[in-house]
């Protein structure tokens, strides 16, 4: 199957090898790889064709048993509209794009993200929201840390209401322990007579009861504390917004806005806050700026908060978020509009409250009728067993005397035989159950608005002979404030309008369906369409993460296989798939190291990090409770061994870990990597190998063989999961046996390696569900299953070949900053523009914008060295695209030379004025000393950027992060 995945043909591969002076791919790899590093054992994973792969996945899907889930707990059945499934989730224009660091070629997804931020701000009643987080539980931890940063209190106590979901509570405990925060349980009604920096409660508690938190928040604010609320977006269409309740921070999951449960994700969570907190907010933030033509344009704003700039001082370690799912979620809101969302929520609430009343009439003890969607029943929970075994219904068992039932968009429809099955469990007439839906249908939802007329109309609404409806109309938390009034949420409820809107936005963006994205350290390779197909199969997509394990046999077999494959391919003994991004894999690995030392009663908290490391490394170390000590790099870009020895010996009694990326972020295989690991081990530390660059290793080198103790792998880089415009990703953590017990899990015996006894993972959880974003694992499983071990090995070699071919072809155009053994690079290389900038005034930013005119996404800019571009072409690009890139860089060099020899004006030339838009070219006015054709570099199928060059400084000075008003 590698023939489909690998871009160049065998003849083209031979041509590139000949140009470099090698006879075979293995000859090239042997010349590039370090001496003295153990070769991996022969791992035999056979390759398969697409049909065999899909047939096998279909067999696994049939092994899953999809029952009617009424489990709730933050994961809900929902309906993914076909227009969203087809035009977003299955559309490579959306799922193959990268994080929008180059805003001129990202206006489509940036617009959808600012729509998402606006939606969150409107529904939460808060002024600022970011462009998605990861899972809900890790988002809860980020909300806690944000509260700690901005609180006036010096306390380390964080009050957590006892009504929060248990899985969120457990993640909070894991994250709080690492940074010295004390979680204090807050039973309902308990007085607060001690200092605390924050308080967190769930608006609808886990029991289903709606909590009026105004009094609690008022008391906490008087103590200088920050008030945090966990909330449900659908519920907020009916009930008072968190901002109006006094919350300072609100977070939650957008999963029920059309995103399947998929055994835990992927999904998008959200975080909103008061405007004063905008510079402390974690994650990405989209803002409005202006371009060179004074048009509104979107960009990522306030990036100085983030890990790639602030490193250990960043507000969070989050890099990849969940952009694709956030875009799908806001499209769901646009598809339904505010009235449609209210109708869905109203039906759920009507059915849930009505069913609770029926239960009470049948002598069941219901904890509260003051609910949105969840009913708690105080009765022996033998009902759970009977409901599951006899009627395929899943209820949440709290304890031996209590269960919970949650209604959602699907179950509230009361379709099919659901009323009959509920009737058999609870002894209620199925006709009465079915009538609950009829009561909903007779209700008018139009009174949910912020108008005075709505307030005055309460009495007439309440006087109707519909008791459930009356309860909602009279509810003290009933929402009066408006939301989603912007035309973008009201103009696209028709499918034609939404389809055209999404098409227009995707046309503004540059993704892999348009051309090469040679971003260094990002591995923008093929995401094969057939590998993505199974993600939305109902047998996978509709599986609740807390369903009985017997219902997930097929998915669990896939998980077991992929764990075994990843452990064997990387040279480790154990795997946790729980981390929902590479940043979370880093955190999980460092927490495992921390847990290991704590088990030995050793207080080790120093983390050595090379100066060249990615910013997430330092940010993750801080979140794991470690102190960062920077290790210098030498002139060749390698870790300075002398400085490493000095720092390791100086911190010998406190040394916990070294974080090192391999191949290095400078794009070379460091020859002394084994010695680097030995130095750290000598002084009692562990070696964390960042697996971001594993696309240069698979089949040839295993990080666990040269001294790594723990690593993470980026499945959205090396193993075929698409980047989605900024997520979702998966960052599994792999570890040696001595660290395996400290990986995140929930006390499940875990045995991915056939050579070792089973181990129990005792590390605290870091994500909402055991397997993180399990729904995307099918993609990586298919990638490995189809390519096999030899196919993946060939992918590695071709990736290295293409990088070296381009580097050598361009070495006379721009210097290659670092090379390794035999003057070779790994899978990426750094082009140095610093001298050119000095003599011409043309910066790497100018070059990146000019590349847009030529139809390329820019390489990684000014990382890890300012004034450089890091190029990673991957193995998937056709040889014709490789040649086009080489030709383009040479053309740009020729343009720079015209600036140097003063043929071009130094401030008014095709590079300084790039990118060139269609609007500019079509304008009657052309005030530039070069021709229109020179500016646009016209080719067949040309990509036109949606905006001219965007003013970054303006965007950071004028923070505006919601939908701007439409022009007249």
UniProtKB/Swiss-Prot annotation:
**Disulfide-bonded cysteines:** none
User: What is the species listed in this Swiss-Prot or TrEMBL entry?
Assistant: Tropheryma whipplei (strain Twist)
Q: What is this protein called in UniProt?
A: Glycine dehydrogenase (decarboxylating)
Q: InterPro entries given for it?
A: Aminotrans_V_dom (IPR000192), GcvP (IPR003437), GDC-P_C (IPR049316), GDC-P_N (IPR049315), GDC_P (IPR020581), PyrdxlP-dep_Trfase (IPR015424), PyrdxlP-dep_Trfase_major (IPR015421), PyrdxlP-dep_Trfase_small (IPR015422)
Keyword Oxidoreductase in annotation: yes
For this UniProt record, the keywords arranged alphabetically read as follows: Oxidoreductase, Pyridoxal phosphate
GO CC, alphabetical: cytosol; glycine cleavage complex
Query: Which chemical reaction does it catalyze?
Result: N(6)-[(R)-lipoyl]-L-lysyl-[glycine-cleavage complex H protein] + glycine + H(+) = N(6)-[(R)-S(8)-aminomethyldihydrolipoyl]-L-lysyl-[glycine-cleavage complex H protein] + CO2
The EC number(s) attached to this protein equal 1.4.4.2
| General function of this protein | The glycine cleavage system catalyzes the degradation of glycine. The P protein binds the alpha-amino group of glycine through its pyridoxal phosphate cofactor; CO(2) is released and the remaining methylamine moiety is then transferred to the lipoamide cofactor of the H protein.
Q: Which Pfam families match?
A: Aminotran_5 (PF00266), GcvP2_C (PF21478), GDC-P (PF02347)
KW Oxidoreductase (keyword) present? yes
Biological process terms in GO annotation: glycine decarboxylation via glycine cleavage system
Which family, according to the similarity comment?
Belongs to the GcvP family.
Q: Which EC main class describes this enzyme?
A: oxidoreductase
NCBIfam families the record matches: gcvP (TIGR00461)
* Subunit organization: The glycine cleavage system is composed of four proteins: P, T, L and H.
């Amino acid at each position: 199957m590698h023939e489909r995945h690998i871009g160049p043909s065998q003849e083209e591969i031979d041509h590139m090898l000949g140009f470099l002076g090698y006879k075979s791919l293995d000859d090239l790899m042997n010349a590039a790889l370090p001496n003295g590093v153990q070769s991996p054992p022969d791992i035999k994973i056979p390759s398969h064709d697409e049909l065999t792969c899909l047939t096998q996945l279909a067999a696994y899907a049939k092994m899953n048993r999809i029952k009617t889930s009424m489990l709730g707990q933050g994961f809900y059945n929902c309906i993914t509209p076909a227009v969203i499934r087809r035009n977003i989730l299955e559309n490579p224009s959306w799922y193959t794009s990268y994080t929008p660091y180059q805003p001129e070629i990202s206006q489509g997804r940036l617009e959808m993200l600012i729509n998402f931020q606006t939606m969150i701000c409107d529904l939460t009643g808060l002024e600022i929201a970011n462009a998605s987080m990861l899972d809900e539980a890790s988002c809860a931890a980020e909300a806690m840390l944000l509260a700690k940063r901005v609180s006036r209190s010096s306390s380390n106590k964080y009050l957590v209401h006892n009504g929060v979901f248990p899985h969120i509570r457990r993640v909070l405990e894991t994250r709080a322990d690492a940074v010295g925060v004390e979680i204090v349980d807050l039973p309902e009604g308990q007085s607060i007579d001690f200092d605390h920096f924050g308080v967190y409660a769930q608006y609808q508690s886990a029991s289903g009861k709606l909590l009026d938190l105004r009094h609690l928040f008022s008391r906490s604010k008087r103590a200088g504390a920050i008030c945090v609320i966990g909330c449900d977006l659908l519920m907020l269409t009916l009930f008072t917004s968190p901002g109006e309740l006094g919350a300072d921070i609100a977070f939650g999951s957008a999963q029920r806005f059309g995103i399947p449960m998929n055994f835990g994700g992927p999904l998008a969570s959200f975080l909103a806050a008061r405007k004063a907190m905008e510079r402390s907010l974690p994650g990405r933030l989209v803002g409005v700026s202006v371009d060179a033509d004074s048009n509104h344009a979107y960009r990522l704003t306030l990036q100085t908060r983030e890990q790639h700039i602030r490193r250990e001082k960043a507000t969070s370690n989050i890099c990849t978020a969940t952009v694709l799912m956030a875009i799908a979620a806001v499209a769901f809101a646009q598809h339904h509009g505010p009235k449609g969302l209210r109708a869905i929520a109203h039906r759920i609430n009507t059915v849930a409250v009505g069913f609770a009343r029926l239960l009470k009439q049948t002598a069941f003890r219901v904890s509260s009728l003051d609910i949105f969607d969840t009913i708690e029943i105080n009765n022996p929970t033998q009902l759970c067993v009977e409901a599951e075994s006899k009627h395929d219904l899943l209820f949440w068992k709290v304890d031996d005397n209590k269960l919970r039932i949650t209604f959602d968009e699907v179950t509230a429809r009361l379709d099919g035989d659901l009323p009959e099955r509920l009737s058999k469990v609870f002894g209620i007439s199925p006709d009465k159950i079915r009538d609950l839906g009829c009561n909903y249908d007779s209700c008018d939802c139009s009174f949910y608005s912020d108008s005075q007329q709505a307030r005055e109309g309460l009495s007439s609404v309440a006087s109707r002979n519909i008791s459930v409806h009356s309860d909602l109309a009279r509810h003290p938390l009933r929402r009066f404030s408006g939301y989603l009034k912007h035309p973008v949420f009201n103009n696209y409820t028709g499918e034609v309008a939404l389809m055209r809107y999404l098409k227009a936005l995707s046309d503004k963006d540059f993704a892999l369906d348009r051309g090469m994205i040679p971003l260094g350290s990002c591995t923008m390779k093929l995401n094969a369409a057939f590998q993505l197909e199974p993600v939305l199969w109902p047998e996978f997509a509709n599986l609740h993460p807390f369903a009985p394990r017997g219902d997930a046999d097929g998915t669990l077999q896939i998980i077991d296989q992929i764990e075994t494959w990843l452990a064997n391919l990387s040279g480790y003994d154990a795997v946790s798939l729980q981390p929902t991004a590479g940043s979370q894999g880093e955190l999980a690995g460092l927490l495992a190291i921390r847990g290991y030392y704590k088990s030995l009663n050793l207080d080790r908290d120093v983390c050595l990090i090379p100066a060249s490391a990615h910013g997430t490394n330092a940010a993750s170390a801080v979140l794991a409770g470690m102190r960062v000590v920077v290790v210098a790099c030498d002139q060749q870009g390698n870790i300075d061994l002398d400085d490493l020895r000095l720092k390791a010996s100086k911190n010998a009694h406190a040394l916990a870990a070294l974080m090192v990326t391999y191949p290095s972020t400078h794009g070379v295989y460091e020859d002394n990597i084994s010695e680097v690991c030995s130095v750290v081990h000598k002084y009692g530390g562990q070696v964390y190998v960042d697996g971001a660059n594993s696309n240069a290793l698979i089949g040839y080198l295993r990080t666990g063989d040269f001294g790594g103790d723990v690593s993470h792998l980026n499945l959205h880089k090396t193993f075929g999961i698409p980047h989605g415009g900024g997520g979702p990703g998966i960052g599994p953590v792999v570890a040696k046996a001595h660290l395996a017990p400290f990986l995140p899990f929930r006390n499940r015996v875990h045995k991915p390696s056939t050579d070792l006894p089973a181990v129990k993972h005792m590390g605290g959880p870091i994500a909402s569900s055991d397997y993180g974003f399990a729904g995307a694992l099918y993609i990586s499983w298919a990638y490995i299953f189809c390519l096999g071990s030899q196919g993946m090995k060939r992918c590695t070699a071709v990736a290295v070949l293409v990088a070296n071919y381009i580097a050598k072809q361009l070495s006379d155009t721009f210097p290659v900053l670092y090379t390794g053994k035999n003057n070779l690079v790994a899978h990426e290389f750094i082009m140095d523009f610093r001298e050119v900038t000095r003599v011409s005034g043309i910066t790497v930013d100018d070059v990146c914008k000019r590349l847009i005119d030529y139809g390329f996404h820019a390489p990684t800019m000014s990382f890890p060295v300012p004034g450089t571009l890091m190029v990673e072409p991957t193995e998937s690009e056709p040889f014709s695209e490789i040649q086009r890139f080489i030709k383009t860089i040479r053309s740009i060099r020729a343009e720079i030379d015209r600036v140097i020899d003063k043929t071009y004006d130094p401030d008014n030339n095709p590079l300084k004025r790039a990118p060139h838009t269609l609007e500019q070219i079509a304008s009657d006015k052309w005030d530039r000393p070069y021709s229109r054709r020179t500016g646009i570099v016209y080719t067949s199928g040309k990509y036109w950027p949606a905006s001219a060059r965007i003013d970054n400084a303006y965007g950071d000075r004028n923070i505006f992060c919601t939908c701007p008003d439409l022009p007249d």
